[in-house]
A protein has these predicted regions:
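PP2C/PPM-type serine/threonine phosphatase catalytic domain
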Residues: 9-179
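Intrinsic-disorder-associated, low-complexity terminal segments enriched in Asp/Asn/His/Tyr and depleted
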Residues: 1-4, 17
Length: 179
């Protein structure tokens, strides 16, 4: 892991200093000017270090239900997974956390799909998911869809995620331009 290589050249060695990160979390949603109802959900779980937003789609009942279900499932799966890290060697944590986040998104997707199959009034519901899990001195991003994660530093915003959309795929392939 080149990011952790210090002057000794030893992979995985930690620098002698510790970064100090000030985390400010807030959450708010707004229906905007076009829609009649809000389909967003968010989660701020400081005890776990998990922060996420889910932007529902598929009509008010469906989108709101999907985003709320996603936030709940991801929180529960991540909490269970992180509890299992305790007995694992620290050098395996990065991969384990990535697997936990992937499993949480997959589980949320499966549950939303199953719910939509059982209740026809929810047919077509879905949600985006963008979140971050802080553990130790690292942040791990989970991302599905076109809600974006940004890093704010020195008054500047840097986009950390790429949209999972047909349009973005076409732009990345050079078939379309952003204009």
């Amino acid at each position: 892991d080149r990011r952790n290589t210090v002057q000794t050249g030893q992979p995985g060695a930690r620098p002698w200093y510790r970064m100090v990160v000030r985390l400010i979390a807030w959450a708010s949603t707004d229906v905007g000017r076009v829609r009649m109802a809000n389909e967003d959900s968010f989660l701020v779980d400081a005890s776990l270090g998990l922060y996420l937003v889910a932007d529902g789609m598929g009509g008010h009942a469906g989108g709101a239900h999907a985003s709320a279900m996603c936030a709940d499932v991801v929180n529960k799966v991540v909490r269970r997974g992180m509890a299992r890290l305790v007995g694992m060697p620290q050098q395996t944590w990065n991969d384990a956390i990535a697997e936990i986040l992937q499993a949480s998104a997959s589980e949320a997707s499966a549950r939303i799909y199953d719910q939509a199959q059982m209740d026809r009034s929810l047919h077509g519901m879905g949600t985006t998911l963008t979140g971050i899990l802080f553990h130790g001195d690292r942040g791990y991003i989970v991302h599905v869809g076109d809600s974006r994660a940004y890093l704010m530093r020195g008054g500047m915003a840097r986009q950390l995620t790429s949209d999972h959309s047909w349009l973005n795929e076409q732009i990345q392939a050079g078939l379309l331009t952003e204009e």
